[in-house]
Amino acid sequence: QVVDAFSNYSEELLMNGEVDLALVMLPFHSGTIRYEPLYREQIYLAVPKHSDVCQKLGGSESRELETEDLRKLQEEPFILYERGRRMYESSQKLCRSAGFVPKAAFLSNSCESLNAMVGNGMGIGFVPSSVEKTANHEEIVYYSINSPDAIRTLAVGYLEKNLSAAAQGFVKMAKKQNRITG
């Protein structure tokens, strides 16, 4: 059985023994789950191209932001992820490290809808680089962020007890394919 679910729910299914494996953005909240990282991606700040925020950050050319740059945005309306999403946790952590709590203009349940709202000028928000790579949105400038908190890792999680042969094979393949270091 394959279940498509957000990370927190996937972790819950794994802990309850309802699934053998869970693809989850780290961190796992349970210390009993073993995991293999699959890939890492950056988290970008998405900003409407023709906004005052874009000008405040130096124009419509993508560049790397420092924590001090994020601090300039503390009064701006953010489009945030709903609580319980790993991107919610990442967004909050990035803003806290810049010394503020973001002001929510809207809440979103998906990276794609958050990105679309930014493209329609409804606010600014954080998106994973995979969204930037697949989005066809000329109205958004994506800024990378120079922070260890601006990286997220997808991992396959599992409980070692009673792991099926198919699940063991998947974990073995994940270990072999893992090119993440450090």
Residue ranges and their predicted role:
Residues 1-31, 107-108:
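Central regulatory/effector-binding core of bacterial HTH transcription factors
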Residues 1-2, 96-105:
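A local structural motif
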Residues 11, 15, 35, 70, ...:
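Short hydrophobic/charged patches on amphipathic alpha-helices used for structural packing
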Residues 14-24, 43, 100, 118-124, ...:
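Alpha-to-beta junction loops
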Residues 30-78:
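Flexible hinge/capping segments at coil-to-helix
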Residues 30-37, 41, 112-161:
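Beta-alpha-beta core module
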Residues 55-62, 151-182:
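Extended ligand-binding regions for polar small-molecule ligands
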Residues 61-70, 74-98, 164-169, 181:
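Secondary-structure junction motif
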